[in-house]
């Protein structure tokens, strides 16, 4: 079906991502590769000179924690783990999804969405933003 699938995940809210796992696997079927992407907020505005070292250490800690949780998430899939790649980036979900999609020549994005609320108008804010700015098909899973 699809060769390259990007699946943005929040490793600190696994139940949201769990919904999308089976759909991503189905789309990957025979030989597709799923790229799990966790995006941490960028801290450029927090990088005051006298706190830069502390901010850097904190970012490294967050990145390490996210990488460990992504590794745990791989066990939720039934496909061969060699077909699941992991990415941790800093920035906005929307921008990082589009950047990774362009780098990889991705075919589709599979993203979980929260339950409806007034503030997000039926989609989670990340899912909504990804849909509005994506240059490729996006499958939203509830």
Swiss-Prot record:
Protein family according to the UniProt entry: Belongs to the universal stress protein A family.
A Pfam entry, by short name: Usp
Name the record gives this protein: Universal stress protein UP12
InterPro entries referenced in this protein's UniProt entry, alphabetically: Rossmann-like_a/b/a_fold, Universal_stress_UspA, UspA
Effect of disrupting the coding gene: Recovers slowly from late stationary phase growth, increased sensitivity to carbonyl cyanide m-chlorophenyl hydrazone, a proton ionophore and respiratory chain uncoupler.
Keywords noted in UniProt: Phosphoprotein, Stress response
Protein role: Has intrinsic autoadenylation and autophosphorylation activities, probably on Ser or Thr residues.
PTM info: Upon overproduction 2 forms are seen in exponential phase and 3 in stationary phase. Isoform 1 is the most abundant form in exponential phase, isoforms 1 and 2 are equivalent in stationary phase and greater than isoform 3. Isoform 3 is stationary-phase specific and autophosphorylated. Isoforms 2 and 3 are more acidic than isoform 1.
Species in which this protein is naturally found: Escherichia coli (strain K12)
UniProt subunit comment: Interacts with GroEL. Forms homodimers, mediated by the C-terminus of the protein.
């Amino acid at each position: 079906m699809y060769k390259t699938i990007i699946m943005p995940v929040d490793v600190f809210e696994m139940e949201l991502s769990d919904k999308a796992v089976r759909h991503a696997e189905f789309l990957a079927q025979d030989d597709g590769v799923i790229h799990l992407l966790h995006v941490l907020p960028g801290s450029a505005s927090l990088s005051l000179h006298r706190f830069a070292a502390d901010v850097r250490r904190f970012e490294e800690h967050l990145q390490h924690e996210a990488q460990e949780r992504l590794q745990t998430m791989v066990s939720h899939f039934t496909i061969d783990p060699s077909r699941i790649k992991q990415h941790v980036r800093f920035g906005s979900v929307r921008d990082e999804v589009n950047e990774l999609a362009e780098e990889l020549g991705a075919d589709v994005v599979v993203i979980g969405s929260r339950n409806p609320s007034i503030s997000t108008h039926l989609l989670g804010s990340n899912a909504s933003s990804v849909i509005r700015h994506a240059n490729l098909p996006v499958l939203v899973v509830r």
